[in-house]
Amino acid sequence: MASVAVEPQLSVVTRVANLPLVSSTYDLVSSAYISRKDQYPYLKSLCEMAEKGMKTITSVAVTSALPIIQKLEPQIAVANTYACKGLDRIEEKLPILNQPTNQVVANAKGAMTGAKDAVTTTVTGAKDSVASTITGVVDRTKGAVTGSVEKTKSVVSGSINTVLRSRVMQLMSSGVENALTKSELLVDQYLPLTKDELEKEAKKVEGFDMVQKPSYYVRLGSLSTKLRSRAYQQALCRVEEAKRKGQETISQLHSAFNLSELARKNVHNANQKIQDAQDKLYLSWLEWKRSIGYDDTDESHCAEHIESRTLAIARNLTQQLQTMCHTLLSNIQGLPQNIQDRANHLGVMAGDIYSVFRNAASFKEVSDGLLASSKGQLQKMKESLDDVMDYLVNNTPLNWLVGPFYPQVTESESAQAPGTTRRPGRWSRKHPKPVPVSNAEGSQPDDSSS
């Protein structure tokens, strides 16, 4: 005997939502909301941001409550069966639930119009009687429609309240509360308070006022605003730090280039005495070392030693400048393409300057033309850094405010061997890496090398 397939029973919430009267009312409200949103662009952007936040929170709530729902699935199925039976009886008593809103209104209008036409055509002389008859029909129709709608509202409200008071919904609410609290803690941990927020917190502590705990929706909106503001401030601080280090390195490289020019003019000038050239070069070397915070008066002051140390430090500084440029480029994603192209050009110029000193063993291998062009490139880099920072301060990138605030794994990180620890990549674009430098050339000499 062939087995009969049993159709899965719909949940009571799905059945209530699928009722023609409920679904048609929802469609009317939804269409009114969409039309209003399309009429006002600013309202549309705010509504879309709110919808996106609600979708994220709903996804977190569903994920948190899924194990609990699966555990209580038998009890939920039994409760759903009883609720569906009760809904069946209600639908039998109230056929209006299976009619859409426009049909209910049309039927009411049709009944009133038919009664009016029948009374008008048959008894034209009895105006008072016709008027009273029409009034009675209208009142009875309105009473029937109003009573049906009120009963439907009471049934739906009662069902919703019953579900909300159930243990399952209480557990779900608890899960959502825990998820929101955890999100707030993570934001405070990874995105510390800004100066303005610290001042507000200090004022709250001084007042000792009892503040009532805000509602769930207020906390949700505050979390979204807090996340956007702190993420923007942190990104701005990273770019400011990159700019500061870059300008310091550029200033030190200017001094190194000036020292190189001085060495070329004095050491290799046959018209001057060698001893005078060495003394003058040594004094300039000491002055530059003190300006960058490196001072050791015990080392040799021969021209060859100063020459090798100057070239080594110049290589180290140009490598630092190259690394800083790539760090800056990785932190300004979301800015207009012309700003990103300018930052990318900074890295190219830093690589060109580094190539000048990379393989140079003496000042003879660095011509005056290369030094002059390198100094010009340093000045252009300083101006570009100022332009990028000015744009960031005066123009906030929109996608830095609305997200997404999540790391994207780059190709090099996805190919990394398992088990290794590395910070998550911030952007998906691959950037050129600075040229590696050996310890003998790239690092600043220490006292032992003297």
Swiss-Prot record:
Major location (coarse): membrane
UniProt topology in membrane: Peripheral membrane protein
The gene coding this protein: PLIN2
Organism: Bos taurus (Bovine)
PTM notes: Acylated; primarily with C14, C16 and C18 fatty acids.
Entry-linked InterPro entries: Perilipin
Assembly with partners or alone: Interacts with IRGC.
Entry keyword set: Acetylation, Lipid droplet, Membrane, Phosphoprotein, Ubl conjugation
Phylogenetic lineage: Eukaryota, Metazoa, Chordata, Craniata, Vertebrata
Annotated protein name in UniProt: Perilipin-2
